[in-house]
């Protein structure tokens, strides 16, 4: 494959990053009620067709696109001044995203059944003892979120140091990646916080801007500058 084609495919792959931000932004606009404080409202919410379609085509699909975009970003950074950091960050971020996608898939297809049981008057589910599967799910989600945060922060730093991508697109990517995770940690506190705090859509906006900036920078750049010779630092 020629250098122009390789560069073009990298740029197309990078479009997965802003698309992930767009889909996740719309997914966060109508958050589900907190099951710990409003279980009945939560049960009604998760049994709607809207819930399943939103999770499947916004949250889950968005994360799949983020994985493709992360692979493209790591490949593009490989020949830059921050090539090693970019590849390590790519591996960490992708692994974390895959772990989180496992939990997202469970939520998409199992929570509607759980909510339906409550609406049908079958309340014994909430009184059942905790088993290994539930503990493993929470641990998987926690590890996934941590790896996503670490990997994406390192990706942003690699973009800043690369010399081949706009520095501030990396800074936006770091901020956009950190805000949703910090918001989700805040939501877990026992203070009756919103299940999806405002930091989540705010972070998604930053990811859209930062990801689109990176993709545009690659797609508009001459192929020779992006492959081989393209690893040369660009004047900021």
Task: Identify what each model region corresponds to.
Residues 1-236:
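Hydrophobic, aromatic-enriched alpha-helical segments typical of multi-pass transmembrane helices
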């Amino acid at each position: 494959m020629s250098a122009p084609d390789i560069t073009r495919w990298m740029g197309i792959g990078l479009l997965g990053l802003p698309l992930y931000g767009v889909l996740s932004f719309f997914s966060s606009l109508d958050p589900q009620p907190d099951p710990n404080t409003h279980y009945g409202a939560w049960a009604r919410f998760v049994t709607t067709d809207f819930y399943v379609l939103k999770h499947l085509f916004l949250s889950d699909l968005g994360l799949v696109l983020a994985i493709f975009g992360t692979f493209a970003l790591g490949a593009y950074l490989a020949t830059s001044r921050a090539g090693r950091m970019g590849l390590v960050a790519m591996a960490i971020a992708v692994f974390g995203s895959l772990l989180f996608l496992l939990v997202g898939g469970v939520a998409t297809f199992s929570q509607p059944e759980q909510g339906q049981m409550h609406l049908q008057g079958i309340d014994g589910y909430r009184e059942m003892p905790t088993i290994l599967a539930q503990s493993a799910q929470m641990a998987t989600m926690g590890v996934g979120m941590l790896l996503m945060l670490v990997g994406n922060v390192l990706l942003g730093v690699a973009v800043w140091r690369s010399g081949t991508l706009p520095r501030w697109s990396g800074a936006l990517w770091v901020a956009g990646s950190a805000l949703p995770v910090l918001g989700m940690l805040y939501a877990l506190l026992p203070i009756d916080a919103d299940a999806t705090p405002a930091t989540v859509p705010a972070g998604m906006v930053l990811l859209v801007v930062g990801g689109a900036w990176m993709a545009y920078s690659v797609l508009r750049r001459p192929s020779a500058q992006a492959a081989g010779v393209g690893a040369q630092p660009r004047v900021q």
